[in-house]
């Protein structure tokens, strides 16, 4: 087999259905749209979500919850990602410099996922119990 011989598997691609091309085709005359009515005509169709005057689903069900504004400036960082930081001090600035978090982030929590391979000092960041134990086991500290 050569690159110029490549082709899709048999039955993987379907021929486009050509409608309105004579009665012998099986899809001539009305082209699968039936006779008369709104659906047979060009342009007009139903409004999205309209249920014929019945109260639509999106208005029947109650509203709930809200979007927390804290979530926009918060991030979670895996413990294993701290290995990417060149220095031994981990704070917001060093995480941004290492491209681990985006610039608008102001709150960070480190959670235990991955392995820490060097002792680090955590400054001004929240950590889980597992991370605290892992950092102290690696010879680092949390300030």
From Swiss-Prot:
Region (Disordered): which ranges? 20-52
**Cited SUPFAM superfamilies:** Ribosomal proteins L15p and L18e (SSF52080)
Q: Which UniProt keywords apply?
A: Ribonucleoprotein, Ribosomal protein, RNA-binding, rRNA-binding
Presence of the UniProt keyword RNA-binding in the record: yes
GO terms, biological process: translation
State the family it belongs to: Belongs to the universal ribosomal protein uL15 family.
Q: Which HAMAP family match?
A: Ribosomal_uL15
Self-association state and partner proteins as the record states: Part of the 50S ribosomal subunit.
Q: What does this protein do?
A: Binds to the 23S rRNA.
List the protein's name: Large ribosomal subunit protein uL15
Q: What is the lineage of its organism?
A: Bacteria, Pseudomonadati, Pseudomonadota, Gammaproteobacteria, Legionellales
Name the gene. rplO
